């Protein structure tokens, strides 16, 4: 079945006040997410005197990112859709956002991450941990891991926030999105850092000027997000389906 509405968009759309407001919302949401996520890592390193990574540290990172993403998505949902992730490319592939609007969002997200990372360096007098592959982890497995984790994330976004058959599920969407990120961090954090989001890895990379295998944190999420968008659009959204009974939460 064909994808619904893949479109490039117009220059007028890219500069429309509503698009710019949505871009600002993405900037703020990404700032909030990176501040809590990366900030929690800095705080953990301070408390442990930059000690070795531990299961407790991984769990704390998972919780911090899950809570922060829940908030970041919630506060941006009514303005920009609360994407908070350049893997919004998956929404373009699925025909749910124009290419130009997606570019505006991505620029805003990257700027939000850079500004936040620079601010964290200033207020904590510490370096922002940059994403990198753990010792013994190859580039190929790392790429596949980021693809799979981001597929799960974007698929969750489609199922809970994009699918017109979702019914009225209220705040369940941002909760589910936060939960899948937290769960994926428990899986991939020890191997790649579990980025699933090019913006989250880009800001710390710029501020620390650390680019080792950085392309993995772009290619993995963009491929995984694109596949998720295609799969959900082709197999589920365009399929005839009787609306199930819904419950308000």
Curated annotation (Swiss-Prot):
UniProt KW keywords: Membrane, Repeat, Transmembrane, Transmembrane helix, Transport
- Put simply, this protein is called Probable aquaporin TIP-type
Per the UniProt record, one Pfam family is MIP
Q: Which GO terms describe its molecular function?
A: water channel activity
Q: Which organism is it from?
A: Medicago sativa (Alfalfa)
Q: In the UniProt entry, what is the domain comment?
A: Aquaporins contain two tandem repeats each containing three membrane-spanning domains and a pore-forming loop with the signature motif Asn-Pro-Ala (NPA).
The compartments listed are: Membrane
Query: What cystine linkages occur within this chain?
Result: none
